[in-house]
């Protein structure tokens, strides 16, 4: 998860055929390098986006491309170096087991979670900004959230299940948090050396990073 890691890789032939370079625009598209744990960008507060934000729909499209190339299911703007309140979610990899998610691709702008269920659940999360690290994280089962989409249409919705899980993970990013912040002090202490290695650039992953 900023992202979850997809349960299975998806072959993005349209990207390969376009010969897109990371960090460069080709055929009017761009795949961004992912910001890794240790960068202050992941801790800075994110600002709301105005309706006249330059090329907003294009940025959303590029974020989905970046997400797909990295085999993730969620990506927040701070993970590509932009401290704005924007994240995208693609739950389609779960579509085979959960048909209702077969076409679930959404963009969330200026999101505000204002209600969380008392019921919680554990789920094993990962993050593109913390490659190689996966931990069981407890979160509310359902949430209510206000947001606007890439067309700046306002929404007020309830989310449950896997979408609620991914949304909360990405929402943390625009709040300057990462999923390890949700772990117990004891567990965080046990992960201290791994987190230091990530911050020091000692990691391996299949996508471009910065």
Regions found by a protein language model. Give the residues of each.
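Active-site rim/adjacent substrate-binding subdomains
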Residues: 4-168, 173-210
């Amino acid at each position: 998860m900023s992202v979850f890691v997809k349960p299975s890789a998806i072959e993005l032939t349209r990207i390969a055929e376009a010969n897109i370079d990371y960090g460069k625009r080709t055929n009017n598209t761009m795949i961004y390098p992912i910001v890794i744990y240790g960068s202050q960008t992941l801790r800075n507060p994110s600002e709301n986006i105005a309706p006249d934000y330059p090329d907003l729909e294009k940025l959303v499209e590029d974020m989905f491309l970046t997400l797909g190339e990295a085999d993730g299911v969620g990506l927040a703007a701070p993970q590509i170096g932009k401290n704005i309140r924007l994240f995208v979610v693609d739950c389609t990899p779960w579509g085979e087991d959960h048909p209702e998610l077969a076409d679930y691709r959404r963009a969330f702008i200026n999101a505000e979670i204002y209600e969380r269920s008392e019921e919680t659940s554990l789920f094993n999360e990962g993050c593109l900004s913390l490659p190689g690290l996966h931990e069981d994280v407890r979160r509310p089962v359902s949430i209510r959230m206000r947001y606007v989409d890439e067309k700046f249409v306002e929404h007020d919705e309830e989310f449950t299940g896997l979408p609620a899980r991914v949304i909360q993970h990405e929402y943390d990013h625009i709040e300057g948090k990462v999923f390890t912040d949700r772990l117990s002090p004891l567990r965080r202490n046990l992960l201290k050396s791994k987190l230091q290695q990530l911050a020091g650039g000692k990691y391996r992953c299949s996508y471009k990073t910065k």
